[in-house]
UniProtKB/Swiss-Prot annotation:
It holds the Pfam family Spt4. It comes from the Eukaryota. This is Transcription elongation factor SPT4 homolog 2. GO terms for biological process: regulation of DNA-templated transcription; transcription elongation-coupled chromatin remodeling. Coiled coil: none annotated. It is found in: Nucleus. SUPFAM superfamilies: RNA polymerase subunits. May regulate transcription elongation by RNA polymerase II. May enhance transcriptional pausing at sites proximal to the promoter, which may in turn facilitate the assembly of an elongation competent RNA polymerase II complex. The keyword DNA damage does not apply. Keywords: Activator, Metal-binding, Nucleus, Repressor, Transcription, Transcription regulation, Zinc, Zinc-finger. One of its GO terms (molecular function) is zinc ion binding. The lineage of its organism: Eukaryota, Viridiplantae, Streptophyta, Embryophyta, Tracheophyta. Its main location: nucleus.
Length: 116
């Protein structure tokens, strides 16, 4: 997972979506064009229906992280090993079970969201 920076959202508002696994925030079009920098195994750029499965427009707050490995906020949010970029503070829905199994197969940690 990444040292290359993730794309910064090109617009703010209703177009934004957050990855349900890593909480990276981008627009639908950005996920369609480049996928998720932290979760390439979801292959969002190849399967556009998957974007709707593994991202959500329902999230709370947003933080920009330039150097996740040195940011106390990134460590607190457990995103210290992810690519620099914009992240949500919390998502309220879990990753679909099928995608949770994919994370297990890829040996990638997935933590269920806390109840809000």
């Amino acid at each position: 997972m990444g040292s290359a920076p993730a794309q910064i959202p090109t617009s703010f508002g209703h177009e934004l979506r957050a990855c349900l696994r890593c909480r990276l925030v981008k627009t639908y079009d950005q996920f369609r064009d480049a996928g998720c920098e932290n979760c390439p195994f979801f292959k969002m750029e190849e399967d556009h229906e998957r974007i709707v499965e593994v991202t959500t427009p329902n999230f709370n707050g947003i933080i920009s992280v330039m150097d996740p490995s040195r940011s106390w906020a990134a460590r607190w949010l457990r995103i210290g090993k992810f690519a620099p970029g914009c992240y949500t503070l919390a998502v309220s829905e879990p990753l679909p079970e099928e995608m949770q199994h994919l994370c297990q197969e890829e040996r990638v940690q997935y933590v269920l969201p806390k109840r809000m």
